[in-house]
């Protein structure tokens, strides 16, 4: 009886130690990068800085930056992304995978975002990468006055 208890104790000890094996296989390192970005009314190319994870875009004065449609958002193949819901016009219709053109998106997708402030975008692979997108709107107005006496 005593030998049965010893064998049972040894068996349970080995089983308990075996259950403590740690999974130390690391996740692959896949960098989350945005490779192309465009919005409606964009003037020039987007400035994508992969080191600081920032994007700067300039748009003309004819667009509403509070409901600006993203027309191209290309990320590396393994990545998904999310834009903070407070910036999306329709958060439940915003895509989570990159696209080269609006035609690539399913019907009903809405890519409009409020860019009146810098917008954070979280790219996810096996790691998370925080990107910041800034849209600058150039508003240029020229006023001409007839019969002006002195140069302005």
Regions found by a protein language model. Name each.
Residues 20-152:
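Beta-rich interaction/scaffold domains
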Residues 1-8:
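Bacterial N-terminal signal peptides that target proteins for export
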Residues 15-19:
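C-terminal motif of bacterial Sec signal peptides marking the signal peptidase cleavage site
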């Amino acid at each position: 009886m005593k030998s049965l208890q010893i064998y049972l104790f040894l068996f349970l000890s080995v089983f308990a130690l075996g259950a403590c094996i740690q999974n130390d296989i690391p996740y692959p390192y896949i960098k989350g990068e945005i490779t192309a970005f465009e919005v409606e009314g964009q003037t020039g190319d987007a400035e994508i800085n992969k080191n600081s994870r920032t994007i700067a875009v300039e748009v003309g004065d004819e667009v509403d930056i509070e409901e600006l449609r993203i027309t191209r958002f290309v990320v590396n193949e393994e990545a998904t992304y999310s834009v903070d819901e407070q910036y999306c016009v329709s958060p439940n219709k915003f895509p989570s995978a990159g696209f080269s053109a609006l035609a690539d998106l399913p019907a009903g997708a809405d890519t409009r975002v409020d860019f009146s402030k810098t917008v954070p975008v979280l790219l996810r692979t096996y790691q998370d990468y925080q990107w910041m997108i800034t849209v600058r709107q150039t508003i240029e107005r020229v006023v001409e006055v007839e019969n002006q006496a002195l140069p302005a």
